[in-house]
Amino acid sequence: MRMRKGRNTVLLLLSFLFSMAAVAQRHEILNENIRSLQVVANKDWLAMPIMELGNGVLDIHFDDLTHEYHRYSYKLEHCEADWKPTTSLFDSDYVEGFANGNTIDNVEQSLLTNTIYTHYHLSIPNEVCRPKISGNYLLTIYDDDGNDAIKVCFMVKEPFTQSMGIGLNVVTNTDATINTAHQQVEMELKYNSYNVTNPQTQIKTVLLQNKRWDNARWNAKPQYVMSDGLRWSHNANYIFWAGNEYRKFEILSTDVASTGIERIRWDGADFHAYPFIALPRLNYLYDEDANGAFLIRNSNNYNINTESDYMQVHFQLSCPQPVKGDVYVNGDWTYDRFLPQYKMAYDEESKSYQTVIPLKLGYYSYQYIVLNENGRTEIMPTEGSYYQTENTYQALVYYREQGGRTDKLVGYTSFKFKAR
């Protein structure tokens, strides 16, 4: 009975922790004409937007739904571990070149598409703007009138030889449930060459599941504090609902239905794509997915940025009755933002949640999420939560030296869990 009571206590704590809205900055689109924002480090579309200091490149792509040229500029700000702007540094302390007033000059118009758009591409670092130190960065893209259009968040980590060591492991025999619905992360941190005398103030940590910021775990207290590092074991803060495999579809042309698509039609004005109706998942069934990631591409895999059209994608989730809270489509391509354009409406006649989202041709993985009345995310009941679910966990470690002026990103690792 004592064990059951303990597990119930952990579940109550988990219910709160899982759904707490993260205070971190996330990519944000502020101009309604902007679509298909992609932020990719080192050409790895499955990874977080993190590059190594002095090595690697961050590519930012987006479309403006017009053929009119708009002059977009950008500014770069360094942020602390909690994503608040760093106030103790001058621009020259963190940027080589110029932190503000730089223009995006790589511009192309769409070709042979029903939806006309202008494609913009920016790479960081470049000839006029290069990050000089590690940490979090906020890049704001704005128009000629000074109105913010896009906010992009990315990270720069210390080189591998100057990083702390991070080890991750995942167990399904958790302090909440045993081989049922949860996964618990165990983490170990080695300081290596860093001088840490007060880890409570010098070390900050973030643990994410599938790159999601809405259920990220911030600065969990470690169970073990050692002279050379920290260890988190059986930590209630590191218990996650396992969820289920992400759903997915791929649209490579406006003519042929491909993976996950039941049919495509043209209504005289727009192309429409209909993913297969999402039925309730009563059991776990492995299905390889990309954990929310997306990739713009077309059937020719040629000029994908300017010759890929847009489709009106009709999402439909079968559900016997409405659930408490609002239901959203969620993936990397929604930027963990629960906005009206990703919200689903319940249709009594078909007993399903439905919404239509305009998307560019490509591969998309996604999940259905409930946002409760307190603004916290929950598992969609029809999707289920199974301990076998393949999830990827990411750990970020920040360090501030004694008397230091800012937080450095000194550790990052990613661990993919696969049930045996």
Indicate where each model-derived feature is located.
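Ligand-binding face of N-terminal immunoglobulin V-set domains in extracellular IgSF glycoproteins
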Residues: 114-142
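Short, compositionally biased P/S/T/A/G/V-rich stretches that sit at domain boundaries
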Residues: 25-52, 160-175, 289-302
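Basic K/R-rich, polyanion-interacting modules in nucleoproteins and related proteins
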Residues: 273-323, 409-420
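Aromatic-rich carbohydrate-binding modules that target alpha-glucans
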Residues: 96-120, 213-222, 312-361, 373-402
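Bacterial Sec-dependent N-terminal signal peptides
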Residues: 1-26
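Low-complexity, Pro/Ser/Thr- and charge-rich linker/hinge segments at domain boundaries
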Residues: 28-31, 156-180, 387-411
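Contiguous beta-strand segments within globular domains
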Residues: 35-80, 177-191, 302-315
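Short acidic/polar inter-strand loop motif in beta-rich domains
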Residues: 81-83, 129, 143-149, 212-213, ...
